[in-house]
């Protein structure tokens, strides 16, 4: 806010300001902001599938009895008919993390890469306020990091975060787009 005037070296009168708020440029760099407080199931699922590199298909039964399953060979995520919205969102979050893992690191081994992917999915679920029912992967933390030095551990944690962030950023863009379309439609009805 203005806090008096002063005369500069060149003789020009200028206004002195008292700074109330300081922002880091990284705080202003984001082109969109989603309203996370009460995301609907539709918004979350729309966000997860937004600009997805793979397709989704409903089936009666998936391989291995899983309710949601990514098939790298078919570039398809299969999901079982009649799932609860919470199970569907949690499963999609996990499987899109498998898709992102494959995108970043190549072939996916569901056994070997499960800890990294499930950890990333857990982070993603927490970011999107998706309830998580299965946290069994947390029991594997000690075994997974055993024998790694601090540099390797840090790199693995960074990789987990990278997977979660990539899926989260795409989902947030999709949710933001959906919210903007809804807000624009609501404004159009008010006119």
Residue ranges and their predicted role:
Residues 1-191:
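N-terminal accessory/interface modules of nucleic-acid-binding and processing proteins
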């Amino acid at each position: 806010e203005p806090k008096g005037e002063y005369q500069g070296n060149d003789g020009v009168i200028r206004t002195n300001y008292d700074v109330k708020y300081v922002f880091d440029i990284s705080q202003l760099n984001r082109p969109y902001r989603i309203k996370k407080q009460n995301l609907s199931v539709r918004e979350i699922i729309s966000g997860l599938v937004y600009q997805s590199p793979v397709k989704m298909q409903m089936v009666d039964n998936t391989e291995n009895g899983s309710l949601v399953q990514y098939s790298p060979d078919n570039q398809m995520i299969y999901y079982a008919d009649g799932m609860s919205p919470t199970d569907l969102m949690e499963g999609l979050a996990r499987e899109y993390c498998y898709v992102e893992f494959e995108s970043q690191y190549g072939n996916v081994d569901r056994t070997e890469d499960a800890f990294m992917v499930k950890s990333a999915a857990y982070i993603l679920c927490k970011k999107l306020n998706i309830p998580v029912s299965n946290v069994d992967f947390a029991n594997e933390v000690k075994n997974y990091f055993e024998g790694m030095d601090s540099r390797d551990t840090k790199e693995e944690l960074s990789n987990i975060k990278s997977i979660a962030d990539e899926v989260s950023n795409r989902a947030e863009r999709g949710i933001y787009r959906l919210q903007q379309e809804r807000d624009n439609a609501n404004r159009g009805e008010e006119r």
